[in-house]
């Protein structure tokens, strides 16, 4: 009896395997962290083999602890840290360099050159993205330009490229399936989101051979099966793939046009479903593909904040202000306000709507009376201000006024932050019972492909609210606070 869907959630700092049942409930999960490599300031890399090892480990742990046999699994859904690029040898299956992570700024110079050559408008029109080190295309170019012999091998058709989803499907299927889905392809800087094809003009710009690229498929279909020895003697269908933020939008059942979610993970990502039309942004947002399912493609507007949960980690590990991230709420609640203190956590630059990779973090309004509590509160508040920056851009571009914001990710457990978020946005914030919406979205996509769930209506019924945070702050106060944040941003940008 096929009782479960297995979701593999390959994130920036850890890999997880989560088993879901028919009601969309978590049966069991396992997690394993892996090494972050920082070869130079601003560079972030992962070992793709270590990521693969961590995936095998969490599958084994999750199934054995839950006492679930592989033959009870109806299908596998995969969701992944997006943009992170892997290039590997087709024959040996070994990566030729570390995976270059989405956060890494090592291709900033390549991006500057492309902008100087006047490619920005063409890239914007075709991909919905900006020329930025964040996206995969320049990472692939960097690997081909900097690893000895790589370009020659690529031109001979001996190398393969993939985002993490592609790497995992390739490994799980024993090298049979070299595929990605629309949502991940739309983040590469090489994919035309309107005609849904790899784009020759973009590939020429980046000097990336087409033979390296995976086949682009819908987000919900059977791409292949696991090979026996990776899945303990069973061929299980690999049936759903979506980038982490798009998977969360799906897991939050944001199927209607104008519905939006914000995920508070390492970074913060807000996506609004714009239906079957790609809305071009005038305000520094990205136009991206949400998912492809049932022969249709849905688009989304996205705002990306580079530093969110990682700011809380920095308070814990870098500043040693507390031992556990959950303590940040306790400290922040001990003071009535930040007493005029603002923290701008631009550790790796600023994302939407500013897109400035040269800016670094800053703190303003500090006095002799500033305490640890003020500092922690100001850091938490910065997540809410950055989210408001994104929402203002979204409402301006889409012409849709947000009614409620659905939230997920590690930081949403923080009630102080969620209440402040609602106050600053002046809209209700809804936290679901199942916070693992990214993994759930991948599970839903896989389950729909194998007939485990009937349709999106059945899934919509499974979304349940844990808590709704209503705005109660006076408009005058929230506007004043936000004006202070805008001043802090301008001052941060001036200091370069």
Swiss-Prot record:
One BP annotation, GO: glycerol metabolic process
Phosphoprotein is among the record's keywords: yes
Annotated positions binding glycerol: 82-83, 134, 244-245
Modifications the protein undergoes after translation, according to the UniProt entry: The phosphoenolpyruvate-dependent sugar phosphotransferase system (PTS), including enzyme I, and histidine-containing protein (HPr) are required for the phosphorylation, which leads to the activation of the enzyme.
Regulation: Activated by phosphorylation and inhibited by fructose 1,6-bisphosphate (FBP).
Membership in a protein family: Belongs to the FGGY kinase family.
Record note on quaternary structure: Homotetramer and homodimer (in equilibrium).
Protein name: Glycerol kinase
Native species: Bacillus cereus (strain Q1)
């Amino acid at each position: 009896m096929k009782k479960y869907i297995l979701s593999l959630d390959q994130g920036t700092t850890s890999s997880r395997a989560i088993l879901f049942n028919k009601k969309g409930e978590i049966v069991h999960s396992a997690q394993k962290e892996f090494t972050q490599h920082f070869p130079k300031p601003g560079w972030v890399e992962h070992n793709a083999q270590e990521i693969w090892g961590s995936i095998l480990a969490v599958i084994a742990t999750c199934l054995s602890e839950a006492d679930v046999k592989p033959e009870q699994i109806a299908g596998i859904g995969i969701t992944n840290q997006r943009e992170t690029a892997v290039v590997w040898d087709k024959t040996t299956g070994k990566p030729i360099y570390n995976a270059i992570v989405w956060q890494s700024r090592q291709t900033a110079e390549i991006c500057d050159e492309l902008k100087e050559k006047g490619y920005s408008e063409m890239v914007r029109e075709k991909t919905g993205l900006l020329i930025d080190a964040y996206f995969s295309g320049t990472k692939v170019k960097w690997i081909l330009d900097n690893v000895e012999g790589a370009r020659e091998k690529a031109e001979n058709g001996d190398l393969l490229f993939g985002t993490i989803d592609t790497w995992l499907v390739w490994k799980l299927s024993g090298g049979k399936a070299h595929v990605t889905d629309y949502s991940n392809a739309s983040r590469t800087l090489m994919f035309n989101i309107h005609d849904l094809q790899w784009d020759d003009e973009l590939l020429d710009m980046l000097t990336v051979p087409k033979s390296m690229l995976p086949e682009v498929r819908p987000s919900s279909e059977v791409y292949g099966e696991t090979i026996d020895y990776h899945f303990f003697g069973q061929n299980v269908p690999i049936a759903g793939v979506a980038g982490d933020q798009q998977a969360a939008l799906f897991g939050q059942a944001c199927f209607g046009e104008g519905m939006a979610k914000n995920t508070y993970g390492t970074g913060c990502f807000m996506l609004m479903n714009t239906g079957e039309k790609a809305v071009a942004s005038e305000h520094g947002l990205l136009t991206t593909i949400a998912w492809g399912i049932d022969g249709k493609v849905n688009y989304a507007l996205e705002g990306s904040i580079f530093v969110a949960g990682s700011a809380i980690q920095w308070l814990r590990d870098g500043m040693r202000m507390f031992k556990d991230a959950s303590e940040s709420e306790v400290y922040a609640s001990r003071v009535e306000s930040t007493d005029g203190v603002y923290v701008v956590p631009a550790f790796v630059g600023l994302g939407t709507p500013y897109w400035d990779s040269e800016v670094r973090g800053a703190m303003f309004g500090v006095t002799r009376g500033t305490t640890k509590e003020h500092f922690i509160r100001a850091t938490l508040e910065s997540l809410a201000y950055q989210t408001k920056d994104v929402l203002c851009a979204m409402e301006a571009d889409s012409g849709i006024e947000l009614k409620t914001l659905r939230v997920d990710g590690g930081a949403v457990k923080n009630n102080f932050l969620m209440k402040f978020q609602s106050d600053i946005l002046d809209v209700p914030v809804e936290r679901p019972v199942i916070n693992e919406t990214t993994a759930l979205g991948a599970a839903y996509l896989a389950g729909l492909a194998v007939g485990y769930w009937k349709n999106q209506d059945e899934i919509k019924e499974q979304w349940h609210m844990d808590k709704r945070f209503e705005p109660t702050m006076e408009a005058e106060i929230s506007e004043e606070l936000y004006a202070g944040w805008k001043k802090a941003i301008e001052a941060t940008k001036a200091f370069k």
